[in-house]
Amino acid sequence: TYFRENGFNIHKRSQVLGIITRSSKGLCVAGTHGKTTTSTMAAHLLHQSHVGCTAFLGGISKNYGTNLLLSATSPYTVIEADEFDRSFHWLSPWMSVITATDPDHLDIYGTKEAYLESFRHYTTLIQPGGALILHKGLEMQADVQPGVTTYTYSRNEGDFHAENIRIGNGEIFIDFVAPDTRINDIQLGVPVSINIENGVAAMALAHLSGATDEEIKQGMASFRGVDRRFDFKLKNDRIVFLSDYAHHP
């Protein structure tokens, strides 16, 4: 009330992020689940590379102890694009990942069809010259503008995918395959199986934004995860204790 009475403009967070994406190259991660880890991973890959980025994340990065990263020089802004209340419709992405479209927030959307329509509309907001990186096999129909390139990704197939997956002794190594490169023997800093797929999406964003193969490889190995996202608090031969948000529709 004080701010309104004194002439301040008040905006929702999503509206402010929309303003930011109109004045920078927004790298957005949308989807029912996986978006916090994927966006935080992508932000780390870019932040530790020569490309750099600003980032507004939906969780606390364990690498940086914050959900906000700032760069005075990078044109890129990594944003977790939240579909709740259709808030991601305020954004103007340069590139976007869509991780999943399992129906959620039906108190807002009412039906599965309305939920999927919201994602279709979101894809129309991606700016010409940019890209959509769509999880292979989703029910939704993309509707991108002319000049937007659409890629697919998943763990095992798509334009971006993983091969030669090796899991053992608490470690995961993969080869990352992209349309124009292959990065072998990448170690996942957080050796959780779902992070193979999250990592493919994050590496796709970083690669398309100009990070080098070596920067991507080093960044994946040094990624420490997100607070309360499969967060190991205790791990020994007898006990594994995890803290996790544990939200899935």
Regions inferred by a protein language model and the residue ranges of each:
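Phosphate-binding loop of NTP-binding sites
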Residues: 2-136, 140-149, 200, 206-207
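Adenine nucleotide phosphate-binding catalytic loops in nucleotide-utilizing enzymes
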Residues: 109-116, 146-249
